[in-house]
């Protein structure tokens, strides 16, 4: 990754040079040498597909989106030289933003819309739980804040995550 890195005191900002809006990682060095890492908000649809150079967008598909988010963050911490795996981190918080289904129409097909919303939320819960069980079984579970919105900036995404994690030295 072609990072622009700025260090200001105990805080290091990692930003892709193509991104002039926000940092992709912000790392704070704590007094005891541990690192507190804040991860960029990421979707598993367009954003992760592009970052991971995948051919197929996971559109409104939490089972594929959720692992892609974590895979992108893992790539970031590796490329930034912070650690090799997300399993080395203790995630403190996950901020999850869920989007409404893109179809069917809630006006013309309310029952089908409700069923699709239920499917997406169930798939999200299962994919999220499976990720921790399969990839980080020895780690504790972070607190999670989930908010549902009408739409995300990535219109193909069902969820966007942000996170705070700790690398204990």
Question: Which residues does each predicted region cover?
Answer:
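Short, polar/acidic, helix-capping and beta-turn segments at strand->helix junctions
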Residues: 2, 12, 19-169
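Short, positively charged
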Residues: 7, 11
């Amino acid at each position: 990754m072609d990072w622009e890195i700025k260090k200001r005191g105990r805080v290091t900002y990692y930003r892709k040079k193509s991104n002039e809006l926000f940092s992709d990682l912000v790392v704070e060095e704590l007094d005891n040498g541990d690192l507190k890492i804040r991860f960029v908000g990421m979707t598993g649809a367009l954003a992760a597909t592009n970052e991971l150079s995948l051919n197929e967008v996971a559109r409104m598909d939490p089972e594929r989106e959720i692992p892609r988010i974590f895979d992108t963050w893992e790539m970031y911490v590796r490329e930034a030289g912070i650690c090799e795996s997300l399993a080395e981190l203790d995630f403190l918080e996950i901020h999850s933003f869920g989007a409404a289904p893109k179809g069917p129409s809630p006006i013309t097909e309310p029952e089908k819309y409700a069923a699709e919303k239920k499917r997406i939320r169930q798939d999200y819960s299962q994919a999220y739980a499976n990720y921790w069980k399969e990839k980080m079984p020895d780690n504790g579970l972070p607190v999670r804040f989930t908010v549902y919105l009408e739409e995300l900036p990535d219109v193909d995404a069902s969820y966007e995550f942000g996170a705070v994690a700790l690398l204990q030295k």
